[in-house]
Amino acid sequence: MAKAVDKKFCWEIKNFSSLNSERCHSVPVVIGDCKWRLVAFPKGYKADYLSLYLEVADFKSLPSGWRRYVKFRACIVNQLSQELSVQQETQRWFDQNAPGWGFENMLLLTELNAKDGGFLVNGQVMIVAEVEFLEVIGTLDESEEIIKSSDLINKTQEVAQQVKEIIQPNDLINKTQEVAQQVKESIDVNGFQVLPSQVESVRRIFKKHPDIAVGFQVKNQHLRKTFMNFLVNVIETMCQSLQELSNEDLVEVDIALTYLKDAGFKVDWLEKKLDHVKEKKEKEQSGLIILQGIEQQLHELMHKCEKKKSEVLSVGAPLKFDDVV
């Protein structure tokens, strides 16, 4: 296991073309208080792309409730031209339920394995990863402190219960005031308290899909408001341009729609829209790859053109007097 330098580490996958395993992983490196490793699917994961993920290798040894909000940048190095290297970046929460995350469509396998493409040289693929912590919750040191203080917590439980009985009425008053303030700042639309800025959007949703919340049985107004806000945010995410939407964003939208559907919302129409957006995203990515190839060819042709132009000008130059005599 090697220590990462400046939050970056390099993974050289040798004999890439002869790998028979479905997945392979790098040697773990230490960044912060965790061991991280890259996981690759050389034959693709449900697609014709090289899939690449970042994973917490020692997540089972971390304390319960641990979370790491990480900026993850991965680059498939083009060993012939640095400018043609493929890079993707994301920011994600890693936790006990999701210790790994990454890019399902990192690079087309046909482009990766292309002869003289620059990504596969002498049977080797080179990947550079960068991991940056944005927020850390639950460290090993905190876990030890919790264990040491458990006896004190047990001894004070009886007193805490007595205090709780005194505080509860005040908490109830504060909570009631908080809910009342939220309701005051909200507007009712079809039984949902929504922010003034979302009123028009929610009304349009119910106008086009009046049965969207028929199966949603939650009565608590705070939860109803949260779910509706969640739905509006999902739709607003899908309204972003393809350049702003990453493949990971689309995966998150897919998960969010499943969550809403499980809660009782009818979102089949949104699922169809999502499929359409995914198709457009795939076409965009394929088009960009083709465009990149055309631009490279154009660059080479322009270079040849300039060279030939110089030759023609040189040949067409008039003879000097001394050249004739």
Curated annotation (Swiss-Prot):
Annotated MATH domain residues: 6-131
Entry keywords, A to Z: Coiled coil
Pfam families: MATH_2
Organism encoding this protein: Arabidopsis thaliana
Protein name: MATH domain and coiled-coil domain-containing protein At3g58340
InterPro entries, per database record: MATH-CC_domain_protein, MATH/TRAF_dom, TRAF-like
Keyword set includes Coiled coil: yes
Alphabetized Gene3D superfamilies for the sequence: Apoptosis, Tumor Necrosis Factor Receptor Associated Protein 2, Chain A
Record keyword Coiled coil present: yes
Domain of life: Eukaryota
SUPFAM superfamilies assigned to the protein according to its UniProt record, in alphabetical order: TRAF domain-like
